[in-house]
Amino acid sequence: MWKDARADWDVEARDAVDFFLGNHYSQEESDALRAVGQADFVIDRVYAAIEKLKSLLTSRSPKYSAVGREDSDSRMANVWRTLLEYVWDISDGDTQFKQAVHDYATAGMGYLYTYIDPEADYGRGEVKITYLDPFRVYVDPASRNRYADDASGIILSTILTEDQIINMYPQVEAILEDLDTYYDEEDYPSSGKRNSSASFTPDTVYESEYNRVSKYRILERFTKIKVPFYRIFNKQDGSESILDTEKYEKFVQNEQAQLLMTAGLIEIVEVKQTRIKVTATAGDVLLYEQILNTDIYPIVPIPNIWTGTPYPKSDISKVKDSQRLLNKLFSLTLSHAQASA
């Protein structure tokens, strides 16, 4: 349903990507020009402009700043700044950000995704950042927040080959035959232009291996749920603590805590807090469920020309008519020169 809602945006965004790649004419437009003796040449001003924008925005690595709320927090602020720089460094953040800026300028929407790599540092795990192809991300169409904070959910689609899914999810090898193979289409939309620049985009590569490699679609759905927490106030010493459900169950089984509760010296208040739940499925098979200890979606959209919806416009969409005019003028000039020769 969410894919159908953004079908028109897919067409416009793919058209903008084609303009960046130098494919400005559809097959019908190219044939019509040749029928009247005009060439379908392209005087490409879009590519250079986008590359210049990317160069300006990503010429230097970002610098982080953390400020303590009080003077005693200065050391902790330095620790957080160092951690953020470390995460950026191990994630190859410059490359990830450059690709997100590229999607921002061409398709109109870039995405950065924060995740935990459980295999990093010999199993200790690391927090990392990567970019996401905007065509793989499906946002609730009802969202009206620039960063999709009010969305009921975000879906991340990943199409994997058999070898890839076994490598990423070793537990599915035993049930691989139960998973539905996926041959319908790529998340990446097909082009409506003539591929004059011989560009190999995901939709064309997908067709080249169609029916030769088994593929599976993984859907990771991020939703907001309410999770209970417990605020424990000790009237005896004035201390207060916040416990999740697991820690709370252990707390109420503690003999000393039970004595304090019986004496009325412990005040317990249950509060609901928003958290992000991740559910990953492959067809009808549940791969995993996880509740993230945050109320912010780990997928962060970077919209270009904001339209009040999850479907922004790109810089290219604003200059396509000017580029078409330039191409047409050159075609007419060349045709006139040939006729006058």
Question: Which positions does each model-derived feature cover?
Answer:
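Extended alpha-helical, oligomerization-prone segments that build pores/tubes and scaffolds
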Residues: 1-341
